[in-house]
Amino acid sequence: MIELQGLSQRFPGASGDVHALRDVSLSIAAGEVFGIIGRSGAGKSTLVRAINLLNRPSSGRVIVAGQELTALDTGALRLARREIGMIFQHFNLLSSRTVYENVALPLELAGKPKAEIAATVLPLLDLVGLSALKGRYPAQISGGQKQRVGIARALASKPKVLLSDEATSALDPETTRSILELLKQINRDLGLTIVMITHQMEVIKQVCDRVAVLEAGRVVETGRVIDVFLRPQHDVTRAMIGDVISQELPASVLKRVESRLGNGRDHVYRLAFTGEGVDQPVLAQAIRRYGLDFNILHGHIDEIQGQAFGSLAIMATGELADVKAAMEYLQAQGVVVEEFEHVV
């Protein structure tokens, strides 16, 4: 559905060009929810605005639904953009227009007749749960409701792609969850391809199928969300996952175990489980098989896209050869094993 090939973006700066994007290539499949995450200044918003050419890249190709947008003239690009909806952190509603009229605006600008506008807008208001508020003005509704208006407006032209640029970052956690559930429903019901730009790994965890991690204008990691959580490859990814699932031992636990390390018999590991592995007694089996003692130091169980995900920090006590054999056994059972390097 979306192909980004070698995108680079340079902006003039006081001391030379600023490189906002550096040779970014991504492939996003039709019907998936794809997340792009990074810290502030990583280039996320520049990248999402390159998809609909609100920012034209300095070099590279943008292909959406088989059409190369970077090769289109102004008129053809205007038509192509109708198939790409967009929602923003700030809702950009017109204060003088009602909820209904805000959603109808792009159809009015396209010259659609009133009957066709009504046939499109009313079902959209029902979809986003705002039918009862269609006559209200933006000042009379909440932030979450304003974002629902923005979503309905973005869907009015029946796009194939929806771009979401930090659409939940100004909302409280409960409202964020409701908006993410709405986007998941839209993805399921309409088969819409959604690209989520965010700095919040919690958003990625809740709604995305795959994710790309952006740092200093480059894609440093990409993959299925569950795989990225299980096996983060880049320091930036590990840090951002740590925002929602702690990857480090708490200081109180670290202090307690430090005195036992270095004796050759005690080793600290992080174990990550997913899917059916969360429910299997693999630790008990490893203890019996290799005659070890396992002390659980820290643990966390969560859910990613409906799939159970567990993380444990353990101290394994026994002969080094037996400990290593036990870790290899756990890996063979699908457990991700990582030794805490800063502890041992």
From Swiss-Prot:
Superkingdom field: Bacteria
Membrane topology of the entry: Peripheral membrane protein
Compartment list: Cell inner membrane
Enzyme Commission designation: 7.4.2.11
GO cellular component term of the entry, any: plasma membrane
Principal EC category: translocase
Binding positions for ATP per the UniProt entry: G38, R39, S40, G41, A42, G43, K44, S45
Protein name: Methionine import ATP-binding protein MetN
Organism phylogeny: Bacteria, Pseudomonadati, Pseudomonadota, Betaproteobacteria, Burkholderiales
Annotated gene: metN
